[in-house]
Swiss-Prot record:
The gene is NUBP2. This is Cytosolic Fe-S cluster assembly factor NUBP2. CDD domains: Mrp_NBP35 (cd02037). ATP binds at G22, K23, G24, G25, V26, G27, K28, S29. The keyword Magnesium does not apply. It is found in: Nucleus; Cytoplasm, Cytoskeleton, Microtubule organizing center, Centrosome; Cytoplasm; Cytoplasm, Cytoskeleton, Cilium axoneme. It comes from Homo sapiens. Heterotetramer of 2 NUBP1 and 2 NUBP2 chains. Interacts with KIFC1. Interacts with NUBP1. Disulfide bonds: none annotated.
């Protein structure tokens, strides 16, 4: 596909947030999805850019599998997820013939697609663009940061789980952010205990507090802990809106609190 005829498709995006994790399996895409939904329910217009090219799970989480991406006069039109067009999504998952098709590409081709996603998706006016990145640190992260740098991203959320091995990976992720000049907005600890679906009591499954302790040691904000919640897992599998359907759950309280902290940390120029 040729480059968009008119550059500057991110000109109408007020704030860009990258979501990172030091390793796979910590629920990074879950946090990206639910953060976007929470911001949307807070009255913001939100886009999600899924650059996790080898594991594009967000279309399924949002019930958008099988949707088609169309060309417009400015490049690609994102997939809108509601009638009001208040939340939109772009993912490599929309470009695959089958949802479970493997992306077997070398680095240069991946980097080229990331740059094309940044330049050619016609987002229009957005309050927030949430960028879901691959796990770890790689050329794809560098390509994403370099492509977004002219638009001055608000910063990065780093997702971890309570286990020491995950916390150790996050240390490397924080170092990566410092070396690339990417501000760390805060750390989110996911899978922090299990919420019983009957009594809503939260029981520790792994160790607890590793994310908060790491945030204190690194001198970055700790944004909150999100418990394992069967209702959250079910809505992700079914492509439903957890924030809308389970407003009384502990996971809802945690996710909306994180979103509010993001809103509070946003410069006052955003209405």
């Amino acid at each position: 596909m040729e480059a968009a005829a008119e550059p500057g498709n991110l000109a109408g995006v007020r704030h860009i947030i990258l979501v990172l994790s030091g390793k796979g399996g910590v629920g990074k895409s879950t946090i990206s999805t639910e953060l976007a939904l929470a911001l949307r329910h807070a009255g913001k217009k939100v886009g999600i850019l899924d650059v996790d090219l080898c594991g594009p799970s967000i279309p399924r989480m949002l019930g958008a599998q099988g949707r088609a991406v169309h060309q417009c006069d400015r490049g690609w039109a994102p997939v809108f997820l509601d009638r009001e067009q208040s939340i939109s999504l772009m993912s490599v998952g929309f470009l695959l013939e089958k949802p479970d098709e493997a992306v077997v590409w070398r680095g240069p081709k991946k980097n080229a697609l990331i740059k094309q996603f940044v330049s050619d998706v016609a987002w229009g006016e957005l309050d927030y663009l949430v960028v879901d990145t691959p796990p770890g640190t790689s050329d794809e992260h560098m390509a994403t940061i370099e492509a977004l740098r002219p638009y001055q991203p608000l910063g990065a959320l780093v997702v971890t789980t309570p286990q020491a091995v995950s916390v150790g990976d996050v240390r490397r992720e924080l170092t990566f952010c410092r070396k690339t000049g990417l501000r760390v907005m805060g750390i989110v600890e996911n899978m922090s205990g299990f919420t019983c679906p009957h009594c809503t009591e939260c029981t520790s499954v792994f160790s607890r507090g590793g994310g908060e302790e790491l945030a204190q040691l690194a001198g970055v904000p700790f944004l909150g802990s999100v418990p394992l919640d069967p209702a959250l897992m079910r809505t992700l599998e079914e492509g439903h809106d957890f924030i809308q359907e389970f407003p009384g759950s502990p996971a809802f309280a945690a996710l909306t609190s994180i979103a509010q902290k993001i809103l509070d940390a946003t410069p006052a120029c955003l209405p």
